[in-house]
């Protein structure tokens, strides 16, 4: 009688679920799922200089693109974040700046005084100088944080976002006010 109960338990616990699980996949193709092709585009970005309109000082100055990206990352994202998040921000910031350098996207209201980008976060990307960024951090952490930002930018040097062989327009908003804007208006 004990053997009978053991046999029934094995059938109930193992065999029946096996048929149920097998029947759930019965009509599915065994073809592998085809994933979209992914690629990382690394370019030798030229020109390497970007013209920046400083909204505070109302001056235009030229700087190295990678130095500009460091200052954007410092302004846009807390340095305490993980290095991979900082790298993603660096790629997005570089792509945004690069598209503006190429005049790839319309919509400039000449708020830049002839420059590629401005430092007004309400119009372009937030930007702070290295000195300003370091003054916002605790003194003993400032060098570590700046080094982390430099590493994120250096490890992604030349990498931009593309979609269907075109440089992407990586716009975003930091505050939606409870609703999002129509994409046509961005």
Where do the language-model regions lie?
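Conserved, single-site charged/polar hotspot
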Residues: 1-186
């Amino acid at each position: 009688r004990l053997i009978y109960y053991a046999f029934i338990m094995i059938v109930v616990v193992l065999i029946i679920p096996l048929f149920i699980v097998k029947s759930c996949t019965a009509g599915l193709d065994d073809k592998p799922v085809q994933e979209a092709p992914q690629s990382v585009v690394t370019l030798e970005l030229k020109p390497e200089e970007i013209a920046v309109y400083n909204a505070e000082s109302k001056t235009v100055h030229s700087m190295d693109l990678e130095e500009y990206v460091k200052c954007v990352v410092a302004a846009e994202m807390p340095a305490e974040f993980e290095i991979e998040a900082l790298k993603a921000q660096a790629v997005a910031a570089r792509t945004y700046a690069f598209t503006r350098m190429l005049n790839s996207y319309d919509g400039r209201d000449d708020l830049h005084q002839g420059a590629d980008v401005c430092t007004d976060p309400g119009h372009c990307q937030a930007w702070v100088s290295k000195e300003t960024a370091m003054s916002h951090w605790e003194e003993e952490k400032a060098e570590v944080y700046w080094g982390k930002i430099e590493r994120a930018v250096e490890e992604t040097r030349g990498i931009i976002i593309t979609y269907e062989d075109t440089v992407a327009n990586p716009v975003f908003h930091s505050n939606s006010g409870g609703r999002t804007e129509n994409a046509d208006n961005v």
